Amino acid sequence: MSERADEEGLQGKLRLLRLLHQTNPYPQGPGTASQRRNRRRRRRRQWLRLVALANKLCAVPDPPTDSPLDRAIQHLQRLTIQELPDPPTDLPESNSNQGLAET
């Protein structure tokens, strides 16, 4: 189950990176050579920042999973005493020959 959580965390990080990449399209459009060059430079800097962010996201370790001791403590905390019915107030009379066949 831990592997599934790790996989879901990684998929979330990849979705975030994909969204960031899609919001930073390659520059297109008319303009002078210097304008196009500056747009490409800006995009390159933005791309490098995105790569740095991706490295930080992947480098951050996931929070540690619960140790067996923590799980045992949580299990004990969830335990409750069940409501038991009240004991009978009057005891039935016992016969000495109860359960014996009469002869």
UniProtKB/Swiss-Prot annotation:
Where in this protein would one find the motif Nuclear export signal and binding to XPO1, according to its record? 71-82
Region annotation Disordered: residue ranges? 19-42, 80-103
What does this protein do, in the record's words?
Escorts unspliced or incompletely spliced viral pre-mRNAs (late transcripts) out of the nucleus of infected cells. These pre-mRNAs carry a recognition sequence called Rev responsive element (RRE) located in the env gene, that is not present in fully spliced viral mRNAs (early transcripts). This function is essential since most viral proteins are translated from unspliced or partially spliced pre-mRNAs which cannot exit the nucleus by the pathway used by fully processed cellular mRNAs.
Further remark, if any?
This isolate is from a German AIDS patient (with predominantly neurological complications) who was probably infected in Mali.
What does the record say about domains? The RNA-binding motif binds to the RRE, a stem-and-loop structure present in incompletely spliced viral pre-mRNAs. This region also contains the NLS which mediates nuclear localization. These overlapping functions prevent Rev bound to RRE from undesirable return to the nucleus. When Rev binds the RRE, the NLS becomes masked while the NES remains accessible.
Superkingdom, natural source? Viruses
Which positions does the motif Nuclear localization signal and RNA-binding (RRE) occupy?
35-49
A Gene Ontology biological process noted in the UniProt record is: mRNA transport
Q: Which InterPro entries match?
A: REV_protein
Q: What is this protein called?
A: Protein Rev
Q: Where is this region: Homomultimerization?
A: 16-24
Assembly: Homomultimer; when bound to the RRE. Multimeric assembly is essential for activity.
Principal cellular location given in the protein's record: host cell
Record keywords, A-Z: AIDS, Host cytoplasm, Host nucleus, mRNA transport, RNA-binding, Transport
Naming one, the record's GO cellular component terms include: host cell cytoplasm
Q: Which GO terms fall under molecular function for this chain's record?
A: DNA-binding transcription factor activity; RNA binding
